[in-house]
Regions:
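Nucleotidyltransferase catalytic core that binds NTPs
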Residues: 1-149
Length: 149
């Protein structure tokens, strides 16, 4: 995920995704991907990784190595790393409430490797990073918005 900025919906998604398997590896989109999405990084990719890593239930956070908006190369890297483990028997690619399957590159990769793709983890969109950023912008330009009269 982008986690730009991270919010309660992300935490709920991570909590629910952690129930799908023994280990939860979270892919954090890199700063270039944030820009490709049409946004500006609210925090650096390393800050976002540190925060995600600290959330209960996260076994490991991985920074996306992809140069486009997909995470298919990163997903492949994780699969290659874990699938050689003697105890590995399956993998799930989980997405939050704001992502739906639309024959993405990730879907194709998952199907080719027998990875189960699950969407709408954590229910519908509870909060949006973009709405938080817009609210933050309003407060930045209105010095009195933080005071009640």
């Amino acid at each position: 995920g982008y986690f730009n900025p991270i919010h309660i919906g992300h935490v709920d998604y991570i909590k629910n995704a952690s129930k799908l398997g023994d280990r939860l590896v979270v892919i954090v989109n890199n700063d270039r991907q944030v820009e490709l999405k049409g946004s500006t990084p609210f925090m650096s990719e390393y800050d976002r990784m540190s925060i995600v890593s600290a959330i209960k239930g996260v076994h490991r956070a991985v920074l996306s190595i992809d140069a486009d908006r997909s995470v298919v190369r990163t997903l492949g890297s994780i699969y290659d790393e874990y699938s050689v483990d003697y105890f590995f028997d399956s993998m799930v690619f989980a997405n939050g409430g704001d992502v739906n399957s639309v024959n993405s590159r990730e879907d194709w990769y998952c199907e080719s490797r027998g990875i189960k793709a699950v969407y709408n983890i954590g229910g519908g969109k509870m909060q949006s990073s973009s709405s938080l950023l817009k609210a933050s912008e309003k407060k930045r330009y209105d010095p009195y918005s933080m005071y009640e009269f």
